[in-house]
A protein has these predicted regions:
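Active-site neighborhoods and metal-handling regions in enzymes and metal-associated proteins
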Residues: 1-271
Length: 271
């Protein structure tokens, strides 16, 4: 229940940010404004933020842990908001949504977003008792690799299977540089000091809570990336409970598909 409470409080903070996006754009240093708005609601709804909020607009989303939050938020940017409320029990949520600042994804932004969403769906589908923790990343990263291959971004002659080879491949890591999951609870990276056999290679069991958070990141100066993608970074992260026969997405109440995110922004800003 503590995790459900943390997720519910985090949704309040995200919706407060969405409601205030026009002011964040107009006032300058919008990343700081977003950080402040979320922090205010985190402190009011719970004990405070669970970790330093990542409020990364435009190209800043391509810096994995952008916590400086010093930049402007501009019309046409994507805002990557990675934040969580720690409730009074000290359990914390850890959720990421990537939001089109003006309420509408461009075609290129949607193309990236849809790829990440498909990867996350694959990762969530791998969350079930008996699967290894590492199976989540394997499922998600295969979808990422398939999209990069379809876009012609893998080196000539390199197949999806080639890049997934852990010893001789990994070409996809130029654009997806992190793991897809971590355990979550009292610590935002729960059990982070566990051995590999107790963590990455361990079987999932009912009651575990973990994140599923693939992403794609195209720096503004990345000449290997299609020009239409440059300066856009997308991550989608949800908090998932392992159940007896599969999993439950605890943060399913926060929209994830591109269409639903656009509708969410319209609905919140019309209140």
């Amino acid at each position: 229940q503590a995790m459900r409470d943390a997720v519910a409080a985090t949704k309040v903070g995200f919706e407060a940010v969405i409601a205030d996006l026009p002011r964040a754009v107009a006032g300058g240093r919008g990343e700081r404004w977003v950080e402040g708005v979320f922090g205010l609601h985190a402190r009011h709804e719970g004990n405070g933020i669970g970790y330093d909020s990542i409020c990364a607009s435009g190209d800043h989303a391509n810096t994995l842990h952008w916590i400086k939050n010093t930049g402007d938020i501009r019309d046409g940017d994507l805002l990557l908001l990675d934040a969580g409320v720690e409730v009074d029990s000290l359990y914390t949520a850890d959720i990421t949504r990537t939001l089109p600042v003006n309420g509408t994804f461009t075609d290129a932004q949607r193309e990236i977003y849809d790829a990440v969403y498909a990867a996350q769906q694959a990762g969530i589908a791998a969350v079930k008792p008996g699967n290894k923790f590492s199976d989540i990343h394997a499922a998600a990263i295969r979808v990422i690799a398939e999209h990069l291959h379809a876009w012609g971004l893998l080196p000539e002659g390199v197949s999806v299977e080639d890049t997934l080879d852990t010893e001789h491949g990994q070409y996809h890591r130029r654009w997806m540089v992190h793991g897809t999951s971590h355990h979550l609870g009292i610590d935002v990276h729960d059990c982070a000091l566990a051995t590999r056999v107790e963590y990455m290679d361990a079987e999932l069991a009912p009651g575990m809570v973990l994140t599923v958070e693939p992403g794609l990141y195209f720096k503004a100066d990345d000449l290997k990336a299609p020009e239409r993608f440059r300066g856009n970074g997308v991550r989608i992260e949800d908090d998932v409970l392992v159940t007896a026969d599969g999993c439950e997405n605890l943060s399913a109440g926060m929209p994830r598909t591109a269409d639903d995110v656009e509708e969410w922004i319209r609905e919140v800003q019309s209140r």
